[in-house]
Amino acid sequence: MEGRDDGGGKVIGLIEKATKSTAQEVDPRLLKAIKSIVRYSDSEVRLSSQTLMELMRHNHSQVRYLTLFIIDELFMRSKLFRTLIIENLDQLLSLSIGFRSNLPLPAPPAVATTLRSKAIEFLEKWNLSFGFHYKELRLGFDYLKNTLKLKFPDLQANAARIQRERQEREMKTKEILRNKFDSLRVSFGLFKYEIEVTIKEIKECMEIVQWRGDDGVPLAILDEEDFEEIRCSHLRQIRLDSLKQSEKVEETGENRIVFDVLREQCKLLVTKHLISVQEGISLLIRVDVSDNRTRDSMLKDLIDIRNNILAAKKKWEEAGFTMSRMTDIHGNEETNEEEEDIWEEDDGKVKTDSVKNVAHVMRTQQSENSSLPSSGEAKKSTSEARSNKVSNTKKVGSSGNSLRDKLISEAPVMNWGSQLTNWESTTEVRANYRGLEIESHWGRVDQDAIIPADKIAELNLQATVYREERTETPPCRASLKKGGLCQRRDLRVCPFHGPIVPRDDEGNTIIQESPLDESENQTSSTSGTNQDVSMDETTSDSDPNQLARQIAKEALKNIREKDKEVVRKRAKLVKVKVKEHNHEVLRGAAIASTSRSNAMDDEFDRVFAEKKNKKQTFSTRRKKTTAKDRISQRLFSNRVKGTNPQQLAQGNDEKCRDTSANQW
């Protein structure tokens, strides 16, 4: 009993610890410990089911979510636990799915949504596995799906669909592998022959390169006596390395053709044949055919071919013919040839770049001197050479530089891209520049297909979007009441201060004078300056008529000032007359409106009395009055006729509006 009590308390503690987490799943170690304790006895199963149902009543969706995970693990493994849970299935579904309106799922809402979807998924899984044995489980699933119309994930249909898709993919893969196997079986003899010929050519080239004539005896045999005298292992290893190094043959002008053939064959064997052999081996391992004898024989031959290729590769690597070394040698020769071509000019002048010249000079200095110069000296020499080069080019080609600077200033600025790499290039590019073997199920593949230069230029065409240059809009700079200047940036008119005009730092407008005013100012300034000059100086001037000109300018200035004063007084008088006229018009309009309103009231009273006292006589022959008749009668009435003179007066006022704009 004590052992059981200890186990019961332990399982309760583990379950509570597992459900207090904030993770998306239960800790696997705690779940494993719970399952191992529950497996101990039936009492542990009953205690765990009771504890889990109590935790499902907790007012937090995260606790219910983790509790549901533990229930699912134990439900799929224990028959007793299933029986105990199905007895309380109604309560479990309402607490996990929340289909009852009076028992909604607790907060947080995101975890509650996940709890609901997971509970629906677990219920469908339980029904698929144990619905045949438990009627309550079957009825609960049917009620939620058909009555409440809950959306289930339909695990069985999804599993069947996934299984069907996987089978279809496997069938397609088998069919593709079978077709590849048939094509490999047809061309296997030719494929094997090509690889054998390539390996044979590589061996013959290596024999030609390593042949030493009559002195073809290995150095190890000649030095066998000396080799026995060396007792130290370190010295012996150095001796072996030196012997191996002496066996390596360097590429020269005599054996260059053999090296080129060896380089091409090695590249073909590694980049093409070795990859094809490895693909064929993987194909034969995966393919499922009825004729296993043919497949096994082909697999054995491919393994032997792969071993021969690897052996040949190891042999030329031991001999010093590595691919990287051969390509480096070939590239260095090409660069040397290019440098020789650059130095051979018609006039004997050097036209290469300054940086290349400096680099060449540094290489010659390094080859002549055993000690290497420091980085500071190298930088100094490069800077001096560069400055000398720039000065020489400036002196020689000033006209060319001016034309180049002009073209650069007119040229548009573009972002660097791949289209500038092939600018005005007329070279054609191969479609399959990698040298791979491309297969196509739609037709024949041309391995030597090329892309013309005009097509490359069309593919590298770049579209640019026009961008308008941004111009800075000047601020309003009008003075504000609270101090400072207005900083609004409008194009023409500020909504608070009117048209935008040039202003100074204090907010005052800068008046832009007309050419006439400028001429007047110039004349006035000249006259002012001339007035300061004494009469003796003016008379002593070379021009005798200068005094007469000054007097004429002064008289003209006085006349203009008098004219301006007359115009100013006349405008002031007109303004006073307009003001008096407006006052008289307003006074007459006020008097006319009061008398007219009294006359209209008397007229309305008279008409209303006549209509009231008039006897209503109806005649069948009398013509009915229409709206048009009433309007015409109204227009020709005495009241309208009395207003005609006033309308004519209004017409006259409209005619005179332009002449006297401020008069009413």
UniProtKB/Swiss-Prot annotation:
BP GO terms, sorted: response to UV
Bias (Polar residues) ranges: 363-374, 388-402, 521-533, 640-650
UniProt keyword annotation of Membrane present: no
Protein name as catalogued: UV-stimulated scaffold protein A homolog
Coiled coil regions, renumbered to chain: 148-180
Domain of life: Eukaryota
Keyword Zinc-finger: yes
Region span, Disordered: 330-350, 362-403, 514-546, 640-664
UniProt binding sites for Zn(2+): C476, C486, C494, H497
Region described as VHS-like: 10-153
InterPro entries associated with the record: ENTH_VHS (IPR008942), UVSSA (IPR018610), UVSSA_C (IPR049431), UVSSA_N_a-solenoid_rpt (IPR049408)
Biased composition (Basic and acidic residues): 377-387
PANTHER family xrefs: UV-STIMULATED SCAFFOLD PROTEIN A
Chain intervals with Acidic residues compositional bias: 334-347
UniProt similarity note: Belongs to the UVSSA family.
